[in-house]
């Protein structure tokens, strides 16, 4: 599973960067993200970045153990492969921004947010999901269903969930790149409000 996720994620990165280049867009991070990161590759233009792969993959086992649960293998690969900036894409007309850590500090913050998310779901007696991407509607998030491995659009704090793909690799393969400077949230035609 890890290899499939990493391969699909690498393909998303490659397609996204090619899409930006075809449109003459220089991939840069916003000014508030000018924090140190191994994603930076150009000393003369520190705002430029590209995804960076860890020499050895990390995982989320420490927080899964602390939460006394087992995380779906796909989430370890998704967040443990390395670092990246904001990747904007479309899934069947729904504009999404993939959540990716920018550096080690961001990876630690991400883990804290995942712990808080899981604890909130437990308090509400909802099945565990692990967020993957944001959408324009802040009350919804794209997540991995920890039990089934399906990718779902969920209403935060509610039981409302719509299955988008049967697996994380399938979801990633169906993403279409959006221009970095023109992320226009779209309303998905085939999902209920």
From Swiss-Prot:
Signal peptide: none
InterPro entries in the record: Syd, Syd_sf
GO cellular component terms given for this protein: cytoplasmic side of plasma membrane
Annotated membrane topology: Peripheral membrane protein
Gene3D superfamilies: Syd protein (3.40.1580.20)
Superkingdom per UniProt: Bacteria
UniProt entry keywords in alphabetical sequence: Cell inner membrane, Cell membrane, Membrane
Subcellular localization, as worded in the UniProt entry: Cell inner membrane
Role, per record: Interacts with the SecY protein in vivo. May bind preferentially to an uncomplexed state of SecY, thus functioning either as a chelating agent for excess SecY in the cell or as a regulatory factor that negatively controls the translocase function.
UniProt similarity note: Belongs to the Syd family.
Name of the protein this chain belongs to: Protein Syd
UniProt organism field: Tolumonas auensis (strain DSM 9187 / NBRC 110442 / TA 4)
Source organism phylogeny: Bacteria, Pseudomonadati, Pseudomonadota, Gammaproteobacteria, Aeromonadales
